[in-house]
From Swiss-Prot:
It catalyses: a 2-demethylmenaquinol + S-adenosyl-L-methionine = a menaquinol + S-adenosyl-L-homocysteine + H(+); a 2-methoxy-6-(all-trans-polyprenyl)benzene-1,4-diol + S-adenosyl-L-methionine = a 5-methoxy-2-methyl-3-(all-trans-polyprenyl)benzene-1,4-diol + S-adenosyl-L-homocysteine + H(+). S-adenosyl-L-methionine binds at residues 76, 97, 125-126, 142. This is Ubiquinone/menaquinone biosynthesis C-methyltransferase UbiE. GO terms for molecular function: 2-methoxy-6-polyprenyl-1,4-benzoquinol methyltransferase activity; demethylmenaquinone methyltransferase activity.
Length: 253
């Protein structure tokens, strides 16, 4: 049996080629660095629009009161809070993240807001989830898939833990569709964003990586195809704000 390209060889870390086995550690260092300023990072990367994107992502999800939901790369918990509003008191949200620092920030933030009941926190790798088959009615990942080394494995795991009839949703920075806007977006990403990261978070390198990681992420049609290969049916995507981000959806049938 041939060895997986993600257990040997190289992969990308931003625009750099690195040993595949090292990417998880390098990404972990980035998010440990930005954990306390994560919402600021998203504000800088999206000019504040990420809050509207996230709310739309959750309000259009297939979820109902009483459902059990998994939010991967759950970060500081903003998606988890919105999901909990949808599933209500009888439902549950599991916030999963591979990075202990991000998970700690999310737990502290929700606890400080008095949001305790119905939330669970699990440090986990999206490529090998510690949950039984068919555990969740909805699985989401927001602004996290591009940082995963083996995206195909993560999509297969999302499919595995999803109940039959359930939906998986991916919210991610994607490929801008308007040609006239691409140079403006590139200028903001590569010239402005690292400077803002240095100014506000004292960390230009992490913000440079985050901008580069967007350009290395599969474009919309490619990711749709990857979801189909992972087993999902009725896969589709919707561009938001001219393709700066896209929402991908698929179902387990």
């Amino acid at each position: 049996m041939s060895e997986s390209p993600y257990t040997s060889g190289t992969t990308h870390f931003g625009f750099r080629d690195v040993a595949a086995k090292d990417k998880q550690k390098l990404v972990g260092e980035v998010f440990t660095s930005v954990a306390r300023n994560y919402d600021l990072m998203n504000d800088l990367m999206s000019l504040g629009v990420h809050r509207a994107w996230k709310r739309y992502f959750v309000t259009t999800a297939q979820v109902k009161p009483g459902d059990r939901v998994l939010d991967l790369a759950g970060g500081t918990g903003d998606i988890a809070v919105l999901l909990k509003e949808r599933v209500g008191n009888e439902g549950a949200v599991v916030l999963g993240d591979i990075n202990a620092g991000m998970l700690s920030v999310g737990r502290d933030r929700l606890t400080n807001r008095g949001l305790v009941s119905g939330f669970d926190y699990v440090q986990c790798n999206a490529e090998a989830l510690p949950f039984p088959d068919q555990s969740f009615d909805l699985v989401t990942i927001s602004f996290g898939l591009r940082n995963v080394t083996d995206k195909d494995a993560a999509l297969r795991e999302m499919y595995r833990v999803l109940k039959v009839g359930g939906q998986a949703r991916v919210l991610e920075f994607s490929e801008v569709t308007a040609e006239w806007f691409k140079p403006i977006y590139d200028f903001h990403s590569f010239k402005i964003l690292p400077k803002l990261g240095k100014l506000f978070a004292r960390d230009a390198d992490s913000y440079q990586y985050l901008a580069e990681s967007i350009r290395k992420h599969p474009p919309q049609e490619s990711l749709k195809g990857m979801m189909g290969e992972a087993g999902f049916a009725r896969c589709h995507f919707k561009n938001l704000t001219g393709g700066i981000v896209a929402i991908h959806s698929g179902y387990k049938i």
